[in-house]
Amino acid sequence: MSTRSVRKIRETKETKIELYLDIDKKGEVKVSTPVNFLNHMLSTLFYYMNSTATLIAEDKQNFDDHHVVEDTAIVIGEAFKEALGDKKGIRRFSHQIIPMDDALVLVAVDISGRGVSNIELNLERDEIGGLATENIIHFFQTFSYNSGVNMHIIQLRGWNTHHVIEASFKGLGFSLYEASRIVYEETYSLKGSL
C-alpha cells in the first residue's frame, strides 16, 4: 500500500460500505452498489481521479437509494481526507470546465479543510438509472463535508440529465486529482496548515 492509500469500512443498520482507495496509483477501478447509475458515476469519479479503487456498497434495508448514496459519499469523503494526510505540499486548488455534448459544467475545488459546497445543477429528470437525481446533489454535499474539500459545481449549459451529471463527476474527479498532487515543499497556506 502506498502512503496515500486507505481502507475503510462503515457499517450501520442501513448499509455496509467497504472501500480501498489509492490516490497516487492509477489502476483498476471496481465499483459495486445496488444502484446501476451510481456505479457508473463512481467508476467515472475514481477513473478521473487517476486512482485505484474498490468500492462495495450493500443496502441492508432497500427503502430507496438515499442511504446507500449518502453513506457511500461519507466513506469516500473520509477516505480521501485520510489519504491526503497532513496535506503538506499539495497543489490545493483546481478547477475544470468539462464539456459533454450539450452539457458544460464548471467544477472548482479547494482542499482547505472546510467542507462547504455550492452545487448548482438543473437536473430535468427526477430519476436516472435507479437513482433519484436529488441524491446526486446530496452526494456532492456529503462528500464535500466529510472530505473537507470546498467545492463548487455549476452547470453552465445542458439539457441532458445524464450528460450534466457525468460531466460533473468527471470534473470533480480530475479536479481532486490535480489539487491533491504534491508540487510544493511547504503547505500552500499563509496560515501554514490546512
Curated annotation (Swiss-Prot):
SUPFAM superfamilies: Ribosomal protein S5 domain 2-like. GO terms for molecular function: imidazoleglycerol-phosphate dehydratase activity. GO terms for cellular component: cytoplasm. The keyword Cell membrane does not apply. It is found in: Cytoplasm. Gene3D superfamilies: Imidazole glycerol phosphate dehydratase, domain 1. Belongs to the imidazoleglycerol-phosphate dehydratase family. This is Imidazoleglycerol-phosphate dehydratase.
